[in-house]
């Protein structure tokens, strides 16, 4: 096995692209297109196999579009796990981009087949299933990489390391929101994605909180380096009448006691994909907006504001520069964040297969522990809402007060 040892995000470590399979992502899906584009743009993966739809006709038609050979287009993910594990040229990782309720059993099958897993969020629909995957990952010693793409924007990485390096001082408060409009009006009868997102048998205890709240929670954790220790939550339906919440208001305390607010809604007309975060400390504040991903606003206490723009040099930290591929003025956006995620996943999978220990922080990926934390967050929000908005402790520790 050739191992180059390079960690360039556009240079595969094994001197070749890794073989990747997909579960889900075929025609009619949305998230699968982003995964597909990110994997291709990363230059680390060849997509060689897939069970792209639960509808066999759609699965094979989608495979033809993706240039997957007919004998490696599967109608059943379980058959794919068995067949690919038995091949000398079988897939080296699988990307699971199916709806929430299928994640646990599909990931289980591929981990047991000895195949590394790239898994869409949320990890599962229950905390117990998430814990099972954590234990299985440890038992099989295979990777489970959770796909939180926003953390792979260059300017999110910039913000993360600026905060780690003391740019805002001690974190004193944080506000994060993810606001959309698509669930405002009544759903049409053929809106399959919208319908299953309102079915507790398929999504678990929360709808919008699991769908986009987990992204907001993960971004908060990524930037501050802290988990939410306790929270109180209220679920609301602010759009057309539906079975589960389309809006959640969450008040929280971080591990150091700093207060904050997390707000998610899918029923705010005029809001498209408004993932925004603001973190303030005793020395300054940072702001980032997913709809303007190339800019990061930083205001040191008592000084003029600074706008960091994605590009090389001019204050961009090395950890963020690794995620930058074009000069300033040549736009990079969400598909580039997906490509960065798949590139870092490629580095991690290649290193594991070669038995090579990557240098600390050479990749910054989310694993099974992050997936479990996302499920604990959803459960805590649901527990709080169901108890009338009471405070719920996630880690059981006492919380100091700043405000």
UniProtKB/Swiss-Prot annotation:
Q: Oxidoreductase as a keyword?
A: yes
**Which keywords accompany this UniProt record?**
Oxidoreductase, Plasmid, Signal
InterPro entries the UniProt entry points to: Gfo/Idh/MocA-like_OxRdtase_N, Gfo/Idh/MocA_oxidoreduct, GFO_IDH_MocA-like_dom, NAD(P)-bd_dom_sf
> Is this entry keyworded Oxidoreductase?
yes
Q: Give one GO term, molecular function aspect.
A: nucleotide binding
* Enzymatic class: oxidoreductase
Signal peptide annotation? 1-63
Got any disulfides in this one, which pairs?
none
**EC annotation?**
1.-.-.-
Give the protein family.
Belongs to the Gfo/Idh/MocA family.
Q: What is the name of this protein?
A: Uncharacterized oxidoreductase y4hM
User: In which organism is this protein found?
Assistant: Sinorhizobium fredii (strain NBRC 101917 / NGR234)
């Amino acid at each position: 096995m050739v191992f180059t040892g390079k960690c360039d995000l556009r240079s595969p470590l094994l001197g070749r692209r890794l073989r990747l399979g997909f579960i889900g992502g075929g025609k009619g899906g949305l998230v699968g297109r982003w995964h597909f584009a990110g994997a291709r743009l990363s230059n680390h993966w060849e997509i060689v196999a897939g069970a792209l739809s639960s509808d066999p006709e759609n699965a094979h038609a989608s495979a033809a579009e993706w240039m997957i050979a007919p004998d490696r287009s599967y109608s059943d993910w379980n058959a794919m796990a068995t067949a690919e594990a038995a091949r000398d040229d079988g897939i080296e990782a699988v990307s699971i981009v199916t709806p929430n309720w299928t994640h646990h059993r599909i990931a289980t099958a591929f981990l047991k087949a000895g195949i590394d897993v790239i898994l869409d969020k949320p990890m599962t629909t229950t905390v117990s299933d998430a814990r099972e995957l954590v234990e299985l990952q440890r038992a099989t010693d295979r990777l489970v990489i959770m796909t939180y793409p926003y953390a792979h924007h260059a300017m999110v990485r910039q913000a993360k390391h600026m905060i780690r390096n003391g740019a805002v001082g001690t974190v004193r408060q944080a506000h994060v929101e993810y606001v959309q409009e698509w669930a405002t009006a009544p759903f049409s009868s053929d809106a399959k994605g919208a319908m299953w997102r309102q079915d507790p048998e398929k999504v678990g205890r929360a709808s919008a909180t699991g769908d986009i709240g987990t992204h907001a929670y993960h971004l908060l954790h990524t930037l501050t380096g802290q988990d939410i220790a306790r929270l109180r939550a209220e679920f609301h339906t602010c759009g057309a009448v539906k079975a589960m919440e389309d809006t959640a208001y969450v008040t929280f305390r971080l591990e150091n006691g700093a207060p904050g607010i997390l707000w998610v809604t899918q029923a705010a007309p005029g809001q498209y994909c408004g993932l925004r975060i603001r973190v303030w400390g005793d020395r300054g504040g940072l702001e980032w907006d997913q709809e303007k991903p190339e800019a990061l606003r930083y205001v040191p206490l008592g000084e003029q504001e600074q706008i960091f723009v994605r590009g090389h040099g001019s204050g961009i930290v090395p950890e963020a520069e690794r995620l930058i591929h074009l000069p300033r003025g040549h736009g990079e956006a969400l598909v580039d964040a997906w490509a960065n995620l798949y590139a870092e996943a490629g580095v991690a999978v290649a290193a594991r297969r070669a038995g090579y220990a990557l240098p600390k922080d050479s990749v910054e990926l989310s694993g099974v522990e992050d997936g479990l934390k996302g499920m604990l967050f959803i459960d805590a929000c649901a527990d709080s809402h169901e108890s009338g908005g009471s405070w719920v402790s996630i880690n059981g520790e006492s919380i100091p007060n700043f405000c």
